[in-house]
């Protein structure tokens, strides 16, 4: 019935946030806890979750969500949680707590063993989905600032479920040749919507390149294209910008996103605001990169601030016309090696709502000048 139905603006997407209780502002949007709770409550057939790691029991709200999942699984709802092979530290405890949930560890890069599953998304019944930067941890549900998108528009949920199928094909328990065969089966039907064919002004982008499949857009290509075509403004709220790729303990320069930001500021006079995170998970190059941008563009309209509370929000807004929400840092290692799905939209309402979030964060008491 989808081809004959009118497509709602923004594909029925709503922004979703986690805000720590010690912040000086609240959100009018759906909380991550409310979003995950609704997905579980409305599920009738299945719930699929992809996350680097799984540690919901670390906070009270995370534990409540996991208990709801346990209840759903006991009622016969099929629940699969994909974890990266290197993010399975708490797996034994969770399996003993709820044996009816199927936990699958994946390795998306058995050949080189450098790629990780970074994607943070939920899909249920091909009807509802969440994608953003909230992993399936108690912190992301309760104590760490995150941003994502929830939709109950079935075509969009189905399109995201195809990504789940792709990542699931890299089950680390399978032989490598089985991984390749399984992936080959799901890649040809890997997406229905992309930058040239958005649905309601919405589409997903993907990484890394070897998992793209037919007609998917490489996330780095879309991000860099948007940065290079920016005319008036670029607003970035990210945990880190790191112009390097790490392989086997060695660092290699990867300036693609970094250069695109500098070119926009210096060559085209674009107004740029960069709000970076500052906590112990940051790459050593992150603050150095922020300072170098601030210094190099001192004669241009580029401002840098640091968010002082744990902030895993990863948001890009260009010309107040395009919004990008992802689970990856603007980091060469993430973009060259890791597996994730990003949300993109040119829908005016969604862009406007995301812009309000950025403005709120930018002027809050938690945002400090880099020069202080």
From Swiss-Prot:
A lipid is attached at residues 185-186 (S-palmitoyl cysteine). Its EC number is 3.1.1.-, 3.1.4.4. The keyword Lipoprotein applies. Palmitoylated. Attachment of the palmitate moiety is essential for correct intracellular targeting and protein function. Keywords: Host endoplasmic reticulum, Host Golgi apparatus, Host membrane, Host-virus interaction, Hydrolase, Late protein, Lipoprotein, Membrane, Palmitate, Viral budding, Viral budding via the host ESCRT complexes, Viral envelope protein, Viral release from host cell, Virion. Residues 307-334 form the PLD phosphodiesterase domain. GO terms for biological process: viral budding via host ESCRT complex. This is Envelope phospholipase OPG057. It comes from Vaccinia virus (strain L-IVP).
